[in-house]
Amino acid sequence: MNTLVLKIDAILSKHLKKQLAPYTINSQNTYVAFAAKKNGVTVLLYKSGKLVLQGNGANALAQELNLPVAKTVFEASNNSQDIPIIGSDEVGNGSYFGGIAVVASFVDPKDHSFLKKLGVDDSKKLSDKTIQQIAPLLEKQIPHQSLLLSPKKYNELVGKSKPYNAISIKVALHNQAIFLLLQKGIQPKQIVIDAFTSQSNYEKHLKKEKSHFPNPLTFQEKAESHYLAVAVSSIIARNLFLDNLDQLGQDLGYQLPSGAGSASDKVASQLLAAYGMSSLEYSAKLHFANTHKAQALLTK
């Protein structure tokens, strides 16, 4: 995804607003004087005179609008954290048992010292014990929005002849978490999502959602290793997922494993024997191959 940043004068600003008048969108960012979206490209004109175009067609739109493209700054790979950032991440989508936890967190540069003292890093490198110790501290200190989609609700929404698939449900959750966080008055300079699909695919699914915001998005693979805001979300989401997995296990009287390996097949077959399919509808993601594997184990 391309991000073009320009500095334009009052005359060009007036001309730009006229050109993009039919494509105007609302922006809750008090620093934004004008916002529009055309050809999949978000255009933000700040009161400072800074103009930002973000999207795969940013260069083409800049040329169409006769903007001084030669003076633009390419920021697609810029991961500077010296600005307020919202970062979002999800946990649980690769696990048969348990729901999906999605968290969006707002990290200001003034939070960096606190986070580094805690040892905040990619949650995938941290033990579950460490995550369970750090997460409550982060939840108390860092503005965030957490969402948990239970397995039961997941099974109602995801699958053949249902509203969502495994990708579009994550788009919906990330979008809603960020939207709700912005509704609290948060004003980030950048929003980063740990990339789980292409930008074009994300935007395709996003069209089906009711909640929208004008802020441009940055998609970064392994973003939790590059942005503290995403690392914070990863840790809080992991803790939320683990709590959910533990609670589901307590409800059923079984220890539910994380992941989608043979251990999940075995426990799933035990649950089928004890309670029937309703136990998996309550605790697992039914469209995973583990369901059929568990049924096969049961017949042996």
Swiss-Prot record:
Record key words, sorted: Cytoplasm, Endonuclease, Hydrolase, Magnesium, Metal-binding, Nuclease
Cofactor, free-text remark: Manganese or magnesium. Binds 1 divalent metal ion per monomer in the absence of substrate. May bind a second metal ion after substrate binding.
Cellular compartments per GO CC: cytoplasm; ribonuclease H2 complex
Gene Ontology molecular function terms on file: magnesium ion binding; RNA binding; RNA-DNA hybrid ribonuclease activity
Start and end residues of each RNase H type-2 domain: 83-300
Pfam families per record: DUF3378 (PF11858), RNase_HII (PF01351)
Keyword Transport: no
InterPro entries: RNase_HII/HIII, RNase_HII/HIII_dom, RNase_HIII, RNase_HIII_N, RNaseH-like_sf, RNaseH_sf, TBP_dom_sf
One GO BP annotation of this record: DNA replication, removal of RNA primer
Names of required cofactors: Mn(2+); Mg(2+)
First-listed, main subcellular location of the protein, grouped into a coarse class: cytoplasm
Subcellular location: Cytoplasm
Domain of life according to the entry: Bacteria
Entry EC no(s): 3.1.26.4
Residues involved in a divalent metal cation binding: 89-90, 194
Reaction(s) catalysed (UniProt annotation): Endonucleolytic cleavage to 5'-phosphomonoester
General function of this protein: Endonuclease that specifically degrades the RNA of RNA-DNA hybrids.
Family, per entry: Belongs to the RNase HII family. RnhC subfamily.
Name of the featured protein: Ribonuclease HIII
Organism taxonomic ancestry: Bacteria, Bacillati, Bacillota, Bacilli, Lactobacillales
